[in-house]
């Protein structure tokens, strides 16, 4: 009999930025690394003979909580990947909701009906992961192994093993980041011992330290460039408000890429302007639209645009006392130097580290 710990990856930037990231790669967030540390503590006293992960960074980084402290090698297997999301890959969930809302509901609730061009079906994902888990389990008969995989794929497999038909898997639990399930493979029988345990994500005082953020059906913006005359007026007003409130600088003619963010309304809720590849010129969310995670979604768009244009770092120039400082610091922007005018350049490294 093989004991198999099946683990969802830690929080990745795609989760935070509200973008679809099936086969799309990306870094872990600061919270994600906190989850990895909590997972490492959980497995300190658990014997593990081998560790597997998909070949995507977010699972490899998560698996480092187990294989590194135990001095094991990491085995990468593409069959452990998340669902291929086809044409959805890299799109904001808000954009998917606007353009393909029915299929987005299917993705979360009516999984047997979910279809996306150039992507997998739920049944294909379920079959792929089950075959991979069984194959790996047979290879390590009599041992204990850990496998880091992805939320949708894990949900499809565990739902089947717990007796949910594909039509009902949408009623089954969703996995927290780094949630741990234990399976046993005994001959042909693959059974669930426990599912989706996240007890390691709580501190000794029972305060949650790193729980999962909202699902795909919750807040997510879509974006467009200003093209209408009335939008130019809105742009000027939002840009002026941003300059006054956040201490960002720069005239409109210095900006090379401008996006409005829409939070399910006709009027824009947010503004992102890039001064060039790797430099945010302006980032602003209307006061009445704050506390919904929209600011970090704008950072996500800046990250995507920078990476798509060959950049490896992202920066913004702020006044030292800018109220925007906290948002950027929370999202791993570090002060690197001051300008001659006394402003501070904050920079974020967009590269995935290669040591996991």
Residue ranges and their predicted role:
Residues 7-72, 76:
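Active-site-proximal alpha-helix that buttresses catalytic centers in soluble enzyme cores
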Residues 34, 285, 291-304, 330:
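Conserved acetyl-CoA-binding loop-helix of GNAT-fold acetyltransferases
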Residues 70-128, 196-197:
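Phosphate-handling substructures
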Residues 87-95, 159-229, 348-356:
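Acidic, low-complexity terminal tails and accessory targeting/binding regions
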Residues 136, 297-313:
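Conserved acyl-CoA
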Residues 157, 296, 320-337:
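Conserved active-site alpha-helix within GNAT-family acetyltransferase domains
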Residues 236-281, 286, 299:
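Acetyl-CoA-dependent GNAT
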Residues 315-325, 342-343:
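Conserved beta-strand-loop-alpha-helix junction that forms the acyl-donor binding cleft
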């Amino acid at each position: 009999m093989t004991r198999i710990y099946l683990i969802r990856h830690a929080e990745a930037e795609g989760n935070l930025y509200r973008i679809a990231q099936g086969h799309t790669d990306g870094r872990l967030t600061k919270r994600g690394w906190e989850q990895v540390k909590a997972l490492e503590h959980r497995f300190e006293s658990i014997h593990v003979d081998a560790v597997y992960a998909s070949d995507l960074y977010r699972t490899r980084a998560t698996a480092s909580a187990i294989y590194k402290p135990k001095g094991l090698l990491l085995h990468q297997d593409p069959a452990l990947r998340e669902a291929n999301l086809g044409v959805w890959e890299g799109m904001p969930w808000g954009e998917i909701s606007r353009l393909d809302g029915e299929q987005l509901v299917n993705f979360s609730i009516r999984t047997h009906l979910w279809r996306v061009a150039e992507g997998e079906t739920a049944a294909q994902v379920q079959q792929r992961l089950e075959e991979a888990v069984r194959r790996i389990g047979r290879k390590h008969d009599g041992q204990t192994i850990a496998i880091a995989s992805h939320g949708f794929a894990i949900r499809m497999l565990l739902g089947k093993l717990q007796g949910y038909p594909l039509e009902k898997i949408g009623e089954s639990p969703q996995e927290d980041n780094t949630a741990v399930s234990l399976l046993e493979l005994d001959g042909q029988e693959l059974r669930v011992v426990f599912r989706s345990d996240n007890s390691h994500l709580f501190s000794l005082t029972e305060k949650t330290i790193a729980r999962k953020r909202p699902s795909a059906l919750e807040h997510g913006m879509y974006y467009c460039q200003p093209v209408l005359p009335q939008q130019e007026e809105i742009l000027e007003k939002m840009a002026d408000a941003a300059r006054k409130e956040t201490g960002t600088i720069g005239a409109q003619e210095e900006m090379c890429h401008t996006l409005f963010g829409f939070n399910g309304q006709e009027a824009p809720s947010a503004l992102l302007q890039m001064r060039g590849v790797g430099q945010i010129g302006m980032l602003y969310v209307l006061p009445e639209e704050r506390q919904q995670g929209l600011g970090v979604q704008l950072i996500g768009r800046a990250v995507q645009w920078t990476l798509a244009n060959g950049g490896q770092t992202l920066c913004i120039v702020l006044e030292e006392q800018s109220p925007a400082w906290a948002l950027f610091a929370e999202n791993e922007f570090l002060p690197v130097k001051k300008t001659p005018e006394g402003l501070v350049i904050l920079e974020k490294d967009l590269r995935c580290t290669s040591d996991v």
